[in-house]
């Protein structure tokens, strides 16, 4: 396994523990996200400044704007996600959040002119059924309706984040891109905090500061650094498929460490979500290989005729 692959896997495991660490912080969701983005954004900004190179975003303002929009959506999505963590549990909230890629795939024909194949539609159906199983099983244990809404809105914000990121070119990438996103995330959350909780910004000294620092510096700052620095060195197929290990690790870790119940419906829903997503990726790769083979075959035929 290459170094980039190890870094990417480590970042996914780190992200998968976000909910567990957040559950140890007795602060409002918006305050947790505010501290997280402040600490993580500051760390990455210092790394970029320490490189002593001219930042690429100065020469590519449009890309910077897309990344900033992506970061703002990320911050708002985290507010909803952390609220869902507290109301419906880490496992279900994480899986609801990762319905966001399904929204992106559903909109891809309109936004990115990507054609839906029968295999992709089958994968979509599996993911949607999995999400239904995960959420529907909670009716018997009185899951918070607002918690489910927060989980759904976090998925929508995830989709907005991805769409804005894809609109940006690779001119601004890696740690610089993640720094822009985290700083923009902090700005968006700070505006929300000032408007909605202007007089409540002070964090009590009795807060769990070790958990706050871990979530901000390690899970957000270092996690994003590992994630983005590895992503540029890995095939897109591997990045896409392995990315779904994050919600899986969140579910498993929440069951092992927090003792959250992992019911048969949870297991079946998890399998459908992950299996459907992976099936979509594999089917897309196979279709691309078939197109390449046909193109090469056509080129050989043309060459033979010319000869």
PLM region spans:
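Transmembrane alpha-helices of multi-pass small-molecule transport proteins
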Residues: 27-76, 103-104, 156-164, 179-197, ...
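Glycine-/small-residue-enriched transmembrane alpha-helix faces in small-molecule transporters
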Residues: 1-34, 38-42, 72, 76, ...
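Hydrophobic/aromatic residues within transmembrane alpha-helices
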Residues: 25, 32, 84, 96, ...
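Specific alpha-helical transmembrane segments that line the substrate/conduction pathway
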Residues: 31-34, 38-42, 82-113, 154, ...
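Hydrophobic transmembrane alpha-helices of multi-pass small-molecule transport proteins
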Residues: 44, 48, 68, 107, ...
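Helix-helix packing/entry segments at the starts of transmembrane helices
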Residues: 5, 93-99, 165-186, 220-256
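C-terminal-most transmembrane helix of multi-pass membrane proteins
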Residues: 37, 48, 136-137, 208, ...
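Loop-to-transmembrane-helix transition segments
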Residues: 3-11, 55-81, 145-154, 202-222, ...
